[in-house]
From Swiss-Prot:
GO terms for cellular component: chloroplast thylakoid membrane. The chain crosses the membrane at residues 286-306. The keyword Metal-binding applies. This is Cytochrome f. Residues 1-35 form the signal peptide. It comes from Gossypium hirsutum. Belongs to the cytochrome f family. It comes from the Eukaryota. Keywords: Chloroplast, Electron transport, Heme, Iron, Membrane, Metal-binding, Photosynthesis, Plastid, Signal, Thylakoid, Transmembrane, Transmembrane helix, Transport. Component of the cytochrome b6-f complex, which mediates electron transfer between photosystem II (PSII) and photosystem I (PSI), cyclic electron flow around PSI, and state transitions. The 4 large subunits of the cytochrome b6-f complex are cytochrome b6, subunit IV (17 kDa polypeptide, petD), cytochrome f and the Rieske protein, while the 4 small subunits are PetG, PetL, PetM and PetN. The complex functions as a dimer. Its cofactor is heme.
Length: 320
């Protein structure tokens, strides 16, 4: 009996340990996968500075293109597409956090006018859902529904990102007006060069922190280097740490100067920003325009008919 109870207790403990381990894996895995958009969200209340610069450029130092396409005008309470394109050479490989090479990821931030927001799932058409794919958008802040972020996501599959946007209705939203509005977008491909805390990533160039001679280069077991620079005058030494990823440009015995590059720049990605304009159109104006155009068409038809009638009268008078 005692043996059976002991076996049962061991079985319960193993089951509990597996469950706890699985929960920890799920939680930490989720936090890691969602970490990248949080970098900007945690550091900045608004992703667009007063100068117009989007804060993602503080970490992604290389300048690359980005494009946005939106309708020229939309009606109130209407779902439309905002298509963001982040072009790059699909053959490129970036340096990953572990120093190995891998495919590039992409991400984007879309800054809409106040009142515009992510369309609810039940308002998105099947055709638009197919374009969106498995993307999951999130608000930059719970209180800022007009600012959306996405990423990192695989660049080979999502270099073109379709945002489903719902326009506001001034009839129910007093802060919305029938005006022309600006839309701002920022898009990056690849990892950043600087972390929000100011530290460098391994996806950037590393420079010498002193002038002197490279007296020793030690290659670490897990990748990366320790470079010892000896001052030729007083003999004091400085050790520069290079993380796994960047390739060395210097060798032992070489004389170097302060801020001279020790490695190549491995970054193949970059960040870009752009803008577009959209008009929230008043339906009454559209109806008025259609009525005006219709009246012009009818007037033209009436003039043509009157002209033909006049010509018939002239012909009949000449025959008489």
């Amino acid at each position: 009996m005692q043996t059976r109870n002991t076996f049962s207790w061991i079985k319960e403990e193993i089951t509990r340990s597996i469950s706890v381990s699985l929960m920890i894996y799920i939680i930490t895995g989720a936090s890691i996968s969602n970490a990248y958009p949080i970098f900007a969200q945690q550091g900045y209340e608004n992703p667009r500075e007063a100068t117009g610069r989007i804060v993602c450029a503080n970490c992604h130092l290389a300048n690359k293109p980005v494009d946005i396409e939106v309708p020229q005008a939309v009606l109130p309470d209407t779902v439309f597409e905002a298509v963001v394109r982040i072009p790059y050479d699909m053959q490129l490989k970036q340096v990953l956090a572990n120093g190995k090479k891998g495919a590039l990821n992409v991400g984007a931030v879309l800054i809409l006018p106040e009142g515009f927001e992510l369309a609810p799932p039940d308002r998105i058409s099947p055709e638009m859902k197919e374009k969106i794919g498995n993307l999951s958008f999130q608000n930059y802040r719970p209180t800022k529904k007009n600012i959306l972020v996405i990423g990192p996501v695989p660049g080979k599959k999502y270099s073109e990102i379709t945002f489903p946007i719902l326009s506001p209705d001034p009839a129910s939203n007093k802060d919305a007006h029938f005006l022309k509005y600006p839309i701002y977008v920022g898009g990056n491909r690849g990892r950043g060069q600087i972390y929000p805390d100011g530290n460098k990533s391994n996806n950037t160039v590393y420079n010498a922190t002193a002038t002197g001679i490279v007296s020793k280069i030690i290659r670490k077991e897990k990748g990366g280097y320790e470079i010892t620079i000896t001052d030729a005058l007083d003999g004091h030494q400085v050790v520069d740490i290079i993380p796994p990823g960047p390739e060395l440009l210097v060798s032992e015995g070489e004389s170097i100067k302060l801020d001279q590059p020790l490695t190549i720049n491995p970054n193949v990605g970059g960040f870009g920003q752009g803008d577009a304009e959209i008009v929230l159109q008043d339906p009454l104006r559209v109806q008025g325009l259609l009525f005006f155009l219709a009246s012009i068409v009818f007037a033209q038809i009436f003039l043509v008919l009157k002209k033909k009638q006049f010509e018939k009268v002239q012909v009949s008078e000449m025959n008489f």
